[in-house]
């Protein structure tokens, strides 16, 4: 140690070479890695007469130094080179601490140190040397140098005053101030630092540190020498800006730091050892503290770059956002969505930029941490070297403090990193949410991002950056703002969804309206086409039938009134949804198809028939629109009358007895069976059964939904679709055409019995009308559809009567056999046999001329057209012939025919009376028809098993025509033929000839019913002018089948009571002039019975439905009552119903709420008023399990409750007759006492419906069970078990055990 000191001390004094190596070159330290980065390898001494500026020495000094001593350039003063310290001034020794600070120097003016990071040091060495020294170094005397150094240290101690103040002031906003005051006192290397932790976050702004050191020392041997050195160290330390990206606030802080180095006073010594041993030698810990300060400055400088870079970007983004906000104000017309998207985009951009800035800052902090770790390692190495020289405990304690301080710094940096990581993770999550939520806005975001970046480059504004802690504190605010934005977005989405739903509703409404318009246009087109064809046919038939003009006029007038009815018919047709064929077409389409097949005659007939059907349909629809509450009886009867024209009646052979009959329930029975009146002013309509094309190419319009304008059954709101075989229907059609020419002759023969002069005048006109009706019937009456029920049986053979004419015989002899192809051939055979028997049979009934009774019959043409003709027609004097020939097991009917009267008398003499009938008809069950045509009425009704057409005319024969029941539905029901019910026959007598049909002359039909049997040569039966209308039962009636109505048994009971008068008159057989009057009275009685029965039935159905609904809601009230019982309240529950929905519930809460008014009814009224937002509870129904008390009754009346339904009576406090009566009389068997006065009439709510006793037993049982349980509970509470007995039994046992244990312890 001594040698090292001596050699190293002498060499620098004698050094005169110009270019000598520095004695502290980094090459000497093999282990120091960063030496080349901070120091220069050479020190140039330009003047040989001047010594190097404190750091230069010859390489010979290396020979005097031990070779492998590690020297850290940052701490040069450590180790064996302390001799150099003796020659250096104190300020140079301070500046050299910190690693390579002054390794290259120029003697002339300054020694420029190394620029570390953001710090630059300038050293100006001003030398003023006296001439006495001659520019040379001091004396060679070491002792003189030591004394010089001692004096220098003393002067230095006196003059040393280093004050470094750092002041930061920034005005950013209303934020907290930060002040950091640190003072370092370098006394014996101790460092004490006083730091005030920042209350907020501040910005350190442009710290200038001026260090001025003036030293003066005298050289005793060489005279006075003044050397002043001034060190100016200016470092612009990085400023830290704390910006809250989401709060936009900054903080202001002041930091003041005072470093006052102190030294121990020591006396000068004459030797180096005394100097070192006295402890006055400057401690190396000062350099360590300097290094700590330098490290802090380095950290600050490193943060400065990060802050500067991020601040610029954030400030530019802030300015860009401001620009966007201005743009948004200018572009406010774009709407809420654009503004909302911009706001979301700005938030996303800020979060993304914050994430990138945090990543960069994290990288910088990681680099700083690396440097901290490296400096820590270096510090440990230096401590090892320092421990060789400094061994006292005080120095080690100081080093320990410094080390702890360094560790605090490391912990602080680690916390910063962890905070950054947390912020980064949270911001990553935020970024992911925003990206997933707004992925559809990537393009717009990219464009705006480019705009912002360009604006940021143009602006170039410094933006403040926030600390990690600020971001950490800001996170709740960010989340709150995000939640608000999410709520705003949900609101916007809800508004958009509601607008879309509104648009969809508008579109649907438009589409439905458009469909209605198209439908109406098509219907009108069909009507117009029908009218055009009708006008064409009118020109052809106007000469033959002048009455056709009147019919066409009526049709044209009624067209304008039928659009609404047609629309309603179309809607009802859609609701019924018949399973019908796919080949139905309109009447116009059928016309075109017929033209293709090339039947000109049939085409003209079809056009004519279609035109008439259009007119008749429009009239029917008009009547339907006027009386929608009427039944389908008129439609059925008219259809049955049209069937009469075809004579499709009870023709069943014995072959058919074992076969099955297909009964197809009508659609009207399946749906509503409601139809309107059908005013038929003219034209005979027949029922067409085919739906395909026959051999002649005939088509029908049964099934097409838009041919409804010409469909007669659609006037009743029914689509009569019936599938049949083409060939069978074609044959029937051809047969009908062939029979047209025989209609006139048949009418003449039917009325051959009596000839009236007045009828002879009308004969030609009647024949023409019949021909026209026949053509219309054959042309296209299929559009009118079949009746409500259609029966289909096997074919039977029949032979015409030999007395028939040639044409009739030819037709009648045509026997059609079943070919096995299908069941529809049966219909053709029946039709042929019907027409043949009709043409060939001379059997008829007629009555003499005179005033006709209401039961007198009319011709088949009258049945179809609905007209009543003049009594002057001689056809009325002719007896109507019953045509069926007696054949084995053939069903026959009695038909009386009269010629029609002139149409001019029709409007004044004819009225259509229709009876509203839902399901059943006159006698037994639905779908039977009775047509009564009289001078005053033409009533049509429907019966299940019977279809009786009775036509009464002023002048004409009397007859009853029994039609088979017909049905039309989607799925036919197969029933045995014997289940078909026929009306009982009528035993009729004549006034003139008094001819009666004996039982032998009757033949069995169906189930054994007997009808009069007519022979070919038999004279026509002359029926009395006033005959009984009701049928006479020749044999006991057979039980009738129940087809549709569930109450047909009741109707059968009514039916059994009807024919009593008929039986009595049949037994007596007396024919008197007053019989018609008696029969009329009986019919009125029957009609009253039927009407009252229907009313009863309807009322019963309504009551049953209402009772079911009441029971459903009353059970809900019972549920509420059980809730009250669970809490030991009186089990009374109530529900309030509005439009079929429960809007309020309540149960008794008197005990729980301690409120005497908290009854179930009161709670329901309160909640219902809240639900409806009105104290008026109109159109509501209150269901209560117990009869209301007076308080609740007053509240119910005051709330204007429409209906009250209660269950069990309240015998003590009931306000509905049990105690007092406050409600008006209602329904049910409530507690009504005769002695109670009538209830007062409420002035504002006089009409109120009360229904009593709904689920009375259940409600009463609930109350009884509750009171029984409560009495049991009271009994248990009144007699509780005495607790003394329980303890009394246990106490002696305890004492006994204690006595047993005591001897054990004593032993």
Swiss-Prot record:
Catalyzed chemical reaction(s): adenosine(34) in tRNA + H2O + H(+) = inosine(34) in tRNA + NH4(+)
Sequence ranges assigned to domain CMP/dCMP-type deaminase in this UniProt record: 1108-1230
UniProt signal peptide: none
Cofactor: Zn(2+)
EC number from the UniProt entry: 3.5.4.33
Null allele phenotype: Loss of cp-tRNA editing, decreased chloroplast translation and impaired photosynthesis.
Keyword Hydrolase on entry: yes
Note accompanying the cofactor annotation: Binds 1 zinc ion per subunit.
Binding-site residues, Zn(2+): 1159, 1189, 1192
One Gene Ontology biological process: tRNA wobble adenosine to inosine editing
Comment block on domains: The C-terminus (843-1307) is sufficient for the deamination.
The protein's assembly and partners: Homodimer.
Membership in a protein family: Belongs to the cytidine and deoxycytidylate deaminase family.
Protein name per its UniProtKB record: tRNA(adenine(34)) deaminase, chloroplastic
